[in-house]
Regions:
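C-terminal target-recognition/interaction regions appended to catalytic cores
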Residues: 400, 444, 452-458, 462-465
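Bacterial N-terminal signal peptides that target proteins for export
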Residues: 1-9
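Bacterial N-terminal signal peptides
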Residues: 10-18
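Acidic, Gly/Ser/Thr-rich repeat motifs that build Ca2+-stabilized beta-propeller blades
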Residues: 26-197, 378-435, 462-480
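Extracellular/periplasmic ectodomains of large secreted or surface enzymes and adhesion receptors
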Residues: 477-495
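Short, glycine/acidic-rich beta->alpha junctions
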Residues: 62, 71, 109, 169-172, ...
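Bacterial Sec-dependent signal peptides at the C-terminal "C-region" and cleavage site
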Residues: 17-28
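Beta-propeller domain segments
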Residues: 29-50, 193-243, 250-251, 255-442, ...
Length: 495
């Protein structure tokens, strides 16, 4: 029996990591302020290249290893960044040079795997996962620190979750992205999947039959002034407390509000050749995981599924999921609950990041076929979503979105069949379609050749982009046009 597969397109063209896969080690100097002078890296790295003459790229500074999130303090205007192993750094000037001063360490907050950070006024919120059960289990954890001049940051616990099982894969995404509601009343928190595509991940039998649970694959909404909450691994209790905002999202590693206060999230999909979604996230909606990703049905939900890359071109024989036999016949895979409706992803109209695998198995370009996809080229890992909320850019970019792609086709066996491109900055020109009650996006590459970009912030008409590196990372300043007239685009998919 053939595997069911459908591309959920909303229209024909007429007119968005796995996170890092090891828990961090403790810092050796937890309570001691550390400063590191910005320096030019001795490591051979790419220099980002603008793809337009009216966009400039310059090095802002080097940063500590394993940088993940970049922040701007809303009150002071100072830059801060966080690292995967628990550090929070304040960027200051010392003797004319930019300096990274460590102000918070793992010992201060107890988050072994620090992935999320956001400011709400002078309150810095941090989220991630703790280690439990001799590194076989975990809890989600959200804390906040008051960051004010000359005062030691003091921590308040917002929530801890009930403990649940880790797994032995790179797919345990954890609690990782934060966003503050425009009215300042809530913190939105993403908890990614603990599986690749909904399969059993029991950590070699420690957690029998464990798949995803009530605390994963969701975006939560928590009152900004909440303290010492205990979130249970119980879907009914979480819904009764109104903590769950949206469900069925594999891993929304970044979220952002647009100028109209719509919440969007960018998501990375599984090792199957699903496109990478960008969702317009609305309260009470379900976005398909684990049954649909990138507009493509997950074949493992069907009892007759027998994974064979020779028969199913959406399966890559060299993928982690195939090599580890996580794609498997799975007759006990959960069924779609009766009456459950899925909300589709934002539809990409191109001209960039819109390559996809068609029903025939061939790689196609939406520009040539007239098909919109949900939303970005497969395996590209969209991160660092931002919008021009202050409407300071030129007419061409005013109020628009921007997103990074962390993966590059030349270095990814999964992405390379689709494109050699990636690790770039995309301009997102979004428009609402009333008929489908969804958004369409025109996507254009504007800066190329980042090293390992993970996050971005906007200040004035400049984007600041931070890169993750095991030895030395970087922050780049991308200056966008603010008062120039709209320019004609020439060509496509260059760089």
């Amino acid at each position: 029996m053939p595997i069911k597969k459908a591309i959920y397109v909303l229209g024909i063209i007429i007119a968005l990591i796995a996170p890092f896969n090891s828990f961090a080690q403790k810092d050796s100097k937890a309570n001691e302020a550390e400063t590191t002078t910005s320096r030019i890296s001795k490591i051979v790295q790419l220099t980002p290249v603008s793809l337009r003459p009216d966009i400039s790229v310059e090095k802002f500074m080097d940063v500590e290893p394993n940088a993940v999130r970049l922040l701007i303090h809303p009150v002071s205007g100072d830059f801060y960044y966080t690292t995967f192993n628990g550090g929070v750094f304040h960027v200051i000037k010392k003797d004319g040079a930019l300096v990274s001063e460590k102000i918070i360490s793992l010992e201060d907050h107890g988050i072994n795997k620090l992935q999320g950070a956001v400011f709400a006024g002078s309150k810095l919120f941090l989220c991630g996962n703790t280690i439990e059960n001799s590194n076989r289990g975990t809890r989600g954890r959200l804390v906040q620190f008051s960051i004010t001049p000359k005062n030691k940051p003091l921590m308040t616990v917002v929530f801890n979750t009930e403990a649940y099982g880790l797994n032995a894969t790179t797919w345990d995404h954890g609690w990782n992205a934060l966003e503050v509601s425009p009215d300042g009343r809530y913190i939105f928190v993403n908890s990614g999947s603990r599986t690749g595509h909904g399969e059993i991940q029991d950590d070699k039998g420690v957690y029998p039959n464990a798949r995803d649970n009530a605390l994963t694959t969701k975006i939560f909404r928590i009152p900004v002034d909440a303290q010492n909450l205990d979130l249970p691994n119980d879907i009914n209790k979480l819904k009764s407390a109104e903590y769950i905002y949206a469900e069925g999202i594999r891993n929304a590693y970044d979220m952002a509000f647009d100028p109209s206060n719509n919440l969007f999230a960018v998501v990375n999909s599984s090792d199957y050749d699903h496109s990478e979604d960008m969702f317009w996230v609305r309260q009470g909606r379900h976005y398909g995981f684990p049954w649909i990703m990138g507009g493509i049905e997950n074949p493992q939900q069907y009892p007759e599924f027998m994974p064979d890359p020779k028969k199913d071109p959406f399966l890559n024989a060299t993928s982690h999921g195939m090599l580890m036999k996580y794609f498997r016949n799975d007759p006990d895979f959960p069924k779609i609950p009766e009456g459950l409706k899925f909300s589709p992803g934002v539809q990409n109209l191109g001209p960039d990041a819109n390559e996809y695998r068609g029903h025939s198995g061939k790689i196609l370009d939406g520009d040539n076929t007239g098909v919109s996809i949900s939303t970005f080229t497969a395996h590209s890992s969209p991160l660092g979503l931002v919008f021009d909320n202050k409407m300071v850019l030129s007419e061409e970019f005013k109020g628009d979105g921007f997103v990074l792609r962390n993966t590059v086709g030349t270095k990814s066996s999964l992405m390379k069949p689709f494109t050699d491109q990636g690790r770039d900055l995309l301009h997102l020109d979004m428009s609402y379609d009333k008929a489908s009650d969804n958004y369409f996006v025109k996507t254009t590459r504007i800066v190329d050749s980042f090293n390992n970009p993970t996050d971005a912030v906007m200040l004035g008409n400049s984007l600041y982009i931070i890169e993750y590196d095991a030895k030395v990372g970087s922050i780049w300043k991308i200056t966008l046009p603010s008062k120039l007239p709209k320019l004609r685009q020439s060509g496509k998919k260059g760089g």
